[in-house]
Design a protein with these regions (language model features):
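N-terminal, Lys/Arg-enriched amphipathic/low-complexity engagement segments
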Residues: 7-82
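Basic/polar N-terminal segments that are highly enriched at the extreme N-terminus
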Residues: 1-9, 367
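Extended amphipathic ligand-handling, pore-lining, and cofactor/metal-binding catalytic surfaces
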Residues: 287-306, 316-320
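Short alpha-helix capping/helix-loop boundary micro-motifs
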Residues: 18-24, 87-93, 217-222, 321
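Long, hydrophobic/aromatic-enriched structural stretches that serve as scaffold segments
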Residues: 66-115
Length: 367
């Protein structure tokens, strides 16, 4: 089996839109190969942040040598269609032999930080609270850094003060760059990191280049913080070759992602991709409609809709399909088990299509 490297270049990424049916793949892999992707965060590249990642991150106190050259190249050379999403996605990648009706099994083998910093943004009233940002601001971007503390990767951010966009404008006007947040400063807060990719998806069966923002049965912007190293993601295939893509790297995210983004930061990702016949998948997991996660301890079903109540309902129905079709329950007993033993959590409440996921203990159901 091979390791195929997929860098972030203007010819290997899409900015703001998903691949569509008929798009030419930027790479091809065989089932069982590992895709090594230099994923790139969109934060620091966006127009409201100056579309100048070199200057933007210098203004936060980041050394020039620690600012990614591919970020600068994408900002300068790639097209970002007006009205599209913010995300940079690598792909599409052809998975040889994958055809509609099959499922991809994507093992998340490794997620390594490419940088030691990231950004959390609240923009355009699109978080959970439409009243935020305050004081007429369209966007607030908060800088955070990654440090090693007591053997663990930790995020550090300030509690108060100017945001990263203010720091950038001060720097452009000739002011000094901001100082990096330090763990011994009482005006900072520390929190644990758990790197994951917010976007892993397959190409939907449409000729339209959809926005990267809403997720779907094809995966995409799922923003489920369980998509960490050691998790397997299953996705249904809709077009020949699957058209796999990935992006939206995070250092950390709370369930709900309430401010709109979480700690967005670039990662190198190793994804091993396999193909499963639809009939084999159905025998094991039932007639699911959309993404399924498998962690060491849980099977995680997913649901999406414009409103959280409907997303929860969708997720419950997917969970019932798993238990009834794949695990021998009848519908009444499956519903009772879910009520007693499964946790339904908000994946995200900010991506147009709201997301809910359910964690079902594998030990309970013999999986």
């Amino acid at each position: 089996m091979s390791i195929i490297h997929l860098p972030s270049r203007p010819d290997t990424v899409r900015w703001g839109t998903l691949p569509a049916r008929g798009d030419r793949p930027v790479a091809a892999i065989a089932a069982g190969d590992t895709l090594r992707i230099d994923t790139l965060s969109h934060e620091g590249l966006l127009e409201e942040q100056g579309k100048n990642p070199l200057g933007f991150f210098q203004a936060q106190g980041v050394a020039t040598s620690d600012i990614l050259a591919d970020a600068a190249a994408i900002a300068a050379e790639s097209d970002h269609p007006r009205g599209s999403g913010p995300h940079v996605v690598n792909g599409p990648v052809e998975v040889r032999g994958a055809k509609p009706g099959d499922w991809l099994a994507i093992d998340i083998l490794r997620l390594s930080p490419r940088v030691d910093y990231g950004i959390i943004s609240n923009r355009h009233g699109k978080g959970v609270l439409p009243s935020m940002p305050e004081a007429g601001r369209r966007t607030v971007s908060i800088f955070a850094r990654r440090i090693r503390m007591n053997g663990e990767d930790i995020g550090i951010m300030r509690k108060t003060g100017p945001d990263a966009i203010d720091a950038y404008h001060t720097y452009l006007a000739g002011g000094a760059p901001a100082s990096l947040p330090e763990p011994d400063d009482p005006d900072t807060v520390a929190f644990p990191l758990h790197p994951f990719l917010g976007i892993i998806g397959v190409t939907p069966d449409t000729g339209e280049h959809l926005s990267t923002v809403p997720p779907g049965d094809f995966g995409g912007n799922l923003d489920i913080n369980l998509m960490v190293e050691g998790t397997r993601l299953y996705l249904p295939v809709f077009v020949d070759g699957a058209g796999l893509y990935a992006g939206d790297p995070h250092f950390a995210q709370g369930d709900g992602e309430v401010a709109l983004t979480a700690l967005e930061a670039s990662l190198e990702a190793d994804l091993r991709v396999s193909v499963i016949a639809g009939s084999d998948f159905a025998r094991r997991f039932g007639l699911l409609q959309g993404p399924l996660l498998e962690t060491p301890d849980y099977l995680v079903t997913t649901g999406r809709a414009l409103h959280l109540d409907d997303a929860l309902e969708h997720c419950v129905e997917e969970s019932l399909r798993l238990l009834v079709d794949g695990c021998g329950f009848d519908r009444a007993h499956a519903y009772a088990y879910l009520s007693a033993a499964a946790d339904f959590d908000i994946s995200e409440a900010v991506d147009i299509q709201r997301g809910v996921h359910a964690a079902i203990r594998r030990a309970d159901i013999g999986r």
